[in-house]
């Protein structure tokens, strides 16, 4: 009874006891006993820094540290058995007035990382052939490779422009080559991976040379001497060969660096009649490397020209040649360049066709099947609009007219580049159709029925043409046809345009012509100028007022000056900011002409002055002032921003005081107005000079043109016209003066009408009025 009661009590604890026992057993089996003293004790004189040999087979207990490892810790001494403690390095601040030591860094990150350019071409020339063959080499080779240097012996009177010419001071061939190698090592030895030496009597195919050096690897070709191999002349047989200098020599940087200490010895010890043989013997004696024409599947191809025989462009040796030698004269050089360029162009077209075939053959493996390949093959697919506002618009055109004009008119004649573009597209379409249907049919264009084009930023300019054609058969039959064709003018490689350096620190002069009817707007303009320039302490901004008096107002200026409040506000502004000076000019005119007023202001300022022509409604901000400084470039560009004009308060949603809110329902960017402009005085003077020299009707044009049209028609500068979100103007009822020219009056009237409201808002307003009248 007692035994059964005891078993019933111990039965639940049985699995726990078995588990604990099994755990202890497994732990003892997995870890052997470690013979470790209680403490390290003092080291004996004969002890080594390694652990005792008797413990080599002993396993380290978990979370334990071997005594040998503790002794290996730097700075461990008598307390090596204790826990490790971090060593704190004290910070000693620099003494007051003592300049902190700056770290010396390289000028360019490529120098610090050891990044080098790929290829340098050194053209060995002379002062006699530099103006002829040297110029021809530069025109055919200079703009296609990274760096081309012309090495000549004697100094001439004047080097040809656009060429990097180095005078070595040695005319003898071997001495010239010796100094050329020294110059390359000293000036460019650490900047390039490959060096190509070639005389000016050799034509070099730039694309093939670039492909050759791009295929070679410095890891496997560290000591490479590549060219046309040739046996040494006379003497005992030599195991190596040298490279013929007439067909060019390619040297690796490592080989040149290894040759550096032996150049002087080679110059004194090696006797040779040819400079290329002298170089081959020097390289062979110093490095043991001989000339080779093949390296890891790369073959150095060359073409030896025969005098009086034309180049056979169909010859396989011609198509694969990297150099051609000898060249007789510059005309021969240009003829070779034309032939090689034609072969390179055909090779490029062939590669494009092969890539297109490969894309077509592999497109069916994609998830979408053949739909994955866009047309044309290899060009990005058309952009898919995310909303209806991003749909690209097709513009309709015919052979004579375009139905989408820059000035907003429904139809305008095709002129200039647009007309040439349409003619080129029609010619290309007809040529491609004849190529496809030849010789069964010969097609002739009758007329363009419909034409559509649009610009896709992802692809280029797309065209859809409906052509009325006449098909001619070889038997003399005729038949009218109408076909629709699609063409694409793809975008080429995107390039960064070089632009002169500009800075936000340029001094800016704001010009404000102010009529008597606009004098109430002057205080707001002056306060905006003070907020944008005077309060921040912008010393590079100035303001000049041009006060326009009518004849009657000018007669009463002594008794009742209409601009007296404006002058008082200017005086108060100068008292508030002691360093500020706001000059004004008074002009009496009945019909102010923009160009005549600008002529007067231009004469009062230096030629290097940067002008900001503003209107009384312009609200200046620091961002806009800096943008004006950055976008106006002397001798390069003039900036005409488009301000944001608020709609009529009765049409647009109501807004509070201050600048209007930038939105589609509150206003629009005024494309018709050009009241703000940023340009340099020198550019304006140059444009005015062209106007005076090119037109016999200067007086009439001075009355009919404004500054924007002056730069557009009589200046070679790039006119930048862009929206400016920092220029926000509230609505103001404007009246267009009847004294303006027809074009200026039309632009003013169009600006006033478009500034009332959007088409939707005006339509809703008319609808509400009609509903009110009907009831």
Curated annotation (Swiss-Prot):
Catalysed reaction equations from the record: 3-O-(beta-D-GlcA-(1->3)-beta-D-GalNAc-(1->4)-beta-D-GlcA-(1->3)-beta-D-Gal-(1->3)-beta-D-Gal-(1->4)-beta-D-Xyl)-L-seryl-[protein] + UDP-N-acetyl-alpha-D-galactosamine = 3-O-(beta-D-GalNAc-(1->4)-beta-D-GlcA-(1->3)-beta-D-GalNAc-(1->4)-beta-D-GlcA-(1->3)-beta-D-Gal-(1->3)-beta-D-Gal-(1->4)-beta-D-Xyl)-L-seryl-[protein] + UDP + H(+); 3-O-{beta-D-GlcA-(1->3)-[beta-D-GalNAc-(1->4)-beta-D-GlcA-(1->3)](n)-beta-D-GalNAc-(1->4)-beta-D-GlcA-(1->3)-beta-D-Gal-(1->3)-beta-D-Gal-(1->4)-beta-D-Xyl}-L-seryl-[protein] + UDP-N-acetyl-alpha-D-galactosamine = 3-O-{[beta-D-GalNAc-(1->4)-beta-D-GlcA-(1->3)](n+1)-beta-D-GalNAc-(1->4)-beta-D-GlcA-(1->3)-beta-D-Gal-(1->3)-beta-D-Gal-(1->4)-beta-D-Xyl}-L-seryl-[protein] + UDP + H(+); 3-O-(beta-D-GalNAc-(1->4)-beta-D-GlcA-(1->3)-beta-D-Gal-(1->3)-beta-D-Gal-(1->4)-beta-D-Xyl)-L-seryl-[protein] + UDP-alpha-D-glucuronate = 3-O-(beta-D-GlcA-(1->3)-beta-D-GalNAc-(1->4)-beta-D-GlcA-(1->3)-beta-D-Gal-(1->3)-beta-D-Gal-(1->4)-beta-D-Xyl)-L-seryl-[protein] + UDP + H(+); 3-O-{[beta-D-GalNAc-(1->4)-beta-D-GlcA-(1->3)](n)-beta-D-GalNAc-(1->4)-beta-D-GlcA-(1->3)-beta-D-Gal-(1->3)-beta-D-Gal-(1->4)-beta-D-Xyl}-L-seryl-[protein] + UDP-alpha-D-glucuronate = 3-O-{beta-D-GlcA-(1->3)-[beta-D-GalNAc-(1->4)-beta-D-GlcA-(1->3)](n)-beta-D-GalNAc-(1->4)-beta-D-GlcA-(1->3)-beta-D-Gal-(1->3)-beta-D-Gal-(1->4)-beta-D-Xyl}-L-seryl-[protein] + UDP + H(+)
Tissue: Ubiquitous. Highly expressed in pancreas, ovary, brain, heart, skeletal muscle, colon, kidney, liver, stomach, spleen and placenta.
GO biological process: one example: chondroitin sulfate proteoglycan biosynthetic process
GO molecular function (one): N-acetylgalactosaminyl-proteoglycan 3-beta-glucuronosyltransferase activity
Binding site for a divalent metal cation: 617
Polar residues: bias regions: 54-66
Cofactor descriptive note: Highest activities are measured with Mn(2+). Can also utilize Co(2+).
Entry EC no(s): 2.4.1.175, 2.4.1.226
Its job: Has both beta-1,3-glucuronic acid and beta-1,4-N-acetylgalactosamine transferase activity. Transfers glucuronic acid (GlcUA) from UDP-GlcUA and N-acetylgalactosamine (GalNAc) from UDP-GalNAc to the non-reducing end of the elongating chondroitin polymer. Seems to act as a specific activating factor for CHSY1 in chondroitin polymerization.
UniProt-recorded name of the protein: Chondroitin sulfate synthase 2
Organism: Homo sapiens (Human)
């Amino acid at each position: 009874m007692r035994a059964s009661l005891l078993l019933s009590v111990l039965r639940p604890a049985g699995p726990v006891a078995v588990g604990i026992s099994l755990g202890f057993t497994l732990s003892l089996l997995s870890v052997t006993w470690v013979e470790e003293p209680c403490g390290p004790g003092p080291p004996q004189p004969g002890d080594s820094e390694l652990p005792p040999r008797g413990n080599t087979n002993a396993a380290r207990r978990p979370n334990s540290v071997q005594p040998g490892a503790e002794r290996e810790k730097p700075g461990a001494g008598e307390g090596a058995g204790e826990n490790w403690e971090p060593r704190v390095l004290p910070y000693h601040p620099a003494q007051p007035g003592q300049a902190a030591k700056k770290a010396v860094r390289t000028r360019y990150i490529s120098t610090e990382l050891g990044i080098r350019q790929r290829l340098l071409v050194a053209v060995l020339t002379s002062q006699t052939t530099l103006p002829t063959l040297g110029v021809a080499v530069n025109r055919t080779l200079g703009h296609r490779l990274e760096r081309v240097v012309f090495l000549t012996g004697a100094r001439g009177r004047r080097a040809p422009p656009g060429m990097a010419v180095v005078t070595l001071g040695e005319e003898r061939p071997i001495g010239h080559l010796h100094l050329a190698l020294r110059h390359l090592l000293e000036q460019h030895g650490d900047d390039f991976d490959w060096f190509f030496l070639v005389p000016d009597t050799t034509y070099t195919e730039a694309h093939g040379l670039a492909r050759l050096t791009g295929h070679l690897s410095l890891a496997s070709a560290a000591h490479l001497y590549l060219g046309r191999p040739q046996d040494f002349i006379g003497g005992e047989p030599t195991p190596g060969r040298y490279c013929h200098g007439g067909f060019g020599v390619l040297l690796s940087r490592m080989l040149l660096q290894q040759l550096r200490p032996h150049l002087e010895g080679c110059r004194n010890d090696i006797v040779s009649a040819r400079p290329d043989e002298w170089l081959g013997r020097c390289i062979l004696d110093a490095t043991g490397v001989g000339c080779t024409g093949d390296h890891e599947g790369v073959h150095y191809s060359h073409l030896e020209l025969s005098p009086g025989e034309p180049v056979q462009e169909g010859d396989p040796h011609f198509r694969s040649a990297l150099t051609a030698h000898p060249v007789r004269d510059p005309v021969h050089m240009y003829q070779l360049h034309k032939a090689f360029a034609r072969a390179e162009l055909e090779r490029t077209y062939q590669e494009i066709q092969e890539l297109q075939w490969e894309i077509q053959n592999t497109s069916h493996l994609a998830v979408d099947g053949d739909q994955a390949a866009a047309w044309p093959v290899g060009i990005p697919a058309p952009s898919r609009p995310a909303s209806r506002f991003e749909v690209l618009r097709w513009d309709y055109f015919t052979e004579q007219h375009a139905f989408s004009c820059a000035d907003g008119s429904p139809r305008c004649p095709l002129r200039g580049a647009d007309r040439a573009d349409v003619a080129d597209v029609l010619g290309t379409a007809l040529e491609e159709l004849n190529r496809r249907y030849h010789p069964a049919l010969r097609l002739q264009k009758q007329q363009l029925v419909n034409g559509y084009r649009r610009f896709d930023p992802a692809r280029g300019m797309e065209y859809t043409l409906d052509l009325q054609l006449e098909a001619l058969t070889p038997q003399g039959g005729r038949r009218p046809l109408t076909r629709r064709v699609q063409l694409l003018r793809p975008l080429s490689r995107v390039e960064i345009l070089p632009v002169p350096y500009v800075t936000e620190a340029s001094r800016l002069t704001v010009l404000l012509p102010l009529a008597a009817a606009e004098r109430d707007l002057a205080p707001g303009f002056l306060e905006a100028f003070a907020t944008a320039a005077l309060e921040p302490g912008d010393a590079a901004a100035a303001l000049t007022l041009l006060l326009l008096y009518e004849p009657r107002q000018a007669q009463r200026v002594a008794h009742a000056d209409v601009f007296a409040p404006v002058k008082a506000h200017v005086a108060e502004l100068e008292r508030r900011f002691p360093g500020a000076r706001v000059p004004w000019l008074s002009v009496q005119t009945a019909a102010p002409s923009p160009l005549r007023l600008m002529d007067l202001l231009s004469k009062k300022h230096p030629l290097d002055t940067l002008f900001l022509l503003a209107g009384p409604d312009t609200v200046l901000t620091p961002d806009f002032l800096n943008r004006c400084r950055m976008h106006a470039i002397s001798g390069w560009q003039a900036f005409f921003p488009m301000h944001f004009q608020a709609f009529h308060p009765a049409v647009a949603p109501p807004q509070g005081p201050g600048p209007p809110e930038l939105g589609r329902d509150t206003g629009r960017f005024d494309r018709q107005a050009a009241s703000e402009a940023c340009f340099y005085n020198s550019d304006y003077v140059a444009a005015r000079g062209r106007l005076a020299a090119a037109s016999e009707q200067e007086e009439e044009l001075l009355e009919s043109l404004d500054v924007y049209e002056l730069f557009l028609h009589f200046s070679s500068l790039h006119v930048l016209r862009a929206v400016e979100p920092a220029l926000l103007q509230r609505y103001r009822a404007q009246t267009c003066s009847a004294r303006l020219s027809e074009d200026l009056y039309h632009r003013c009237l169009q600006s006033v009408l478009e500034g009332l409201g959007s088409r939707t808002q005006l339509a809703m307003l008319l609808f509400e009025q009609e509903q009110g009248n009907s009831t």
